Amino acid sequence: MRKLSLCPDAVAKIHGGEQAPCLKGSVKFFQLPGGVLVEAELTGLPSQPPSGFFAFHIHEKGDCSGEGFPNTGGHYDPESRPHPFHAGDLPPLLSCKGGAYLAVITGRFCVKDVIGRSVVIHVGPDDLHSQPAGNAGAKIGCGVICKT
């Protein structure tokens, strides 16, 4: 049995924009034999309604510059699938008092495929059906995925 390495294969350091200036944290990626373990740990998420759910996606481009992170492109979707079946569609983050932790294993991509792309957190939940991206609202956090 293979043991999980304590060192991730890639990491994205998340920072907030104008709508969530205190947002920070990391998203780690561990390549496993059967998929990728994605582990997110964040603080400083907004505590206002509509809910404590925040959409969480991998976007095509690794450019977190500019207010509102306009240069991240669409969801990472190498197979041109409809939303919510993009490779970059991840489960929502659930915040409690501004903090969120999520660990999920996905078989939709390999770590090497997402290095250089971005992780984006949106202000609201993903409705899981609106096209092309789930109507999750503004981008409030971003981090570029870098090989460790």
Positions of predicted regions on the chain:
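N-terminal leader/targeting pre-sequences
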Residues: 1-148
